[in-house]
């Protein structure tokens, strides 16, 4: 028995375009991002990787990416489950800040520590900051972080994956997760059992489906999965890696 899981990062967002740390700030897709999401859905249809259920975050860039991709794949009718635990990593006080300016102000070492360290979060956000989520009604009753490292994201994604997503896979469904660079990196780390050093080098491109076929123990048959458009994925991952450079 093998299981099919598809990971899809949202298309380009407004703050991807302006090179800002986004985190939990609910920014929209750009026109390019919408086009990327449509192409992602077309790839699902072309490769006959048709999801039966989709999981997404509570942020519109992921929700809209899922909707656009599903529409393009003629799967807009399938069930959707949304949960904050699939949200992007919370970037704390960096949310809204320009990545290049942060790199210039604090230096390469600190910038990369905050951006790619597994266990070191950025500075915490002030609860009164315009980009804080303390009073956002969608998180009523849920813990709102003030900053997260990737380890924190794994801590929230892992139990959700095991309790909500694994049962759908075990039922034989093809599952699509439309989420964010870091919540998807958390899943990649879990599936491939990557070290902290290995996951630091993983960059997820926007809106290119990443297919994992899993064995009965939920281990990847092909390590790191397979992008449905490998050439575009390689170029997209390189662009993500270059964010914040001059």
UniProtKB/Swiss-Prot annotation:
> Which is a GO BP term held by this UniProt record?
gluconeogenesis
The UniProt record gives the binding positions of substrate as 9-16, 22-23, 61, 88-91, 99, 115-116, 181-182
Question: What does UniProt list as catalytic?
Answer: 10, 88
Q: In which pathway does it act?
A: Carbohydrate degradation; glycolysis; pyruvate from D-glyceraldehyde 3-phosphate: step 3/5
Q: Where is this site: Transition state stabilizer?
A: 180
Keywords linked to the UniProt accession: Gluconeogenesis, Glycolysis, Isomerase
**Enzyme class label:** isomerase
**Cross-referenced CDD domains:** HP_PGM_like
Tell me which EC number(s) this protein carries: 5.4.2.11
Any matching Pfam family:
His_Phos_1
Q: Does the keyword Isomerase apply?
A: yes
What is a GO molecular function of this protein? phosphoglycerate mutase activity
Q: Does the keyword Isomerase apply?
A: yes
Catalysed reactions listed for this entry: (2R)-2-phosphoglycerate = (2R)-3-phosphoglycerate
State what this protein does. Catalyzes the interconversion of 2-phosphoglycerate and 3-phosphoglycerate.
What PANTHER family does this protein's entry cite?
Answer: PHOSPHOGLYCERATE MUTASE
Q: Which family does it belong to?
A: Belongs to the phosphoglycerate mutase family. BPG-dependent PGAM subfamily.
Name used for this protein in its record: 2,3-bisphosphoglycerate-dependent phosphoglycerate mutase
Q: Which organism is it from?
A: Bifidobacterium longum (strain NCC 2705)
Lineage runs:
Bacteria, Bacillati, Actinomycetota, Actinomycetes, Bifidobacteriales
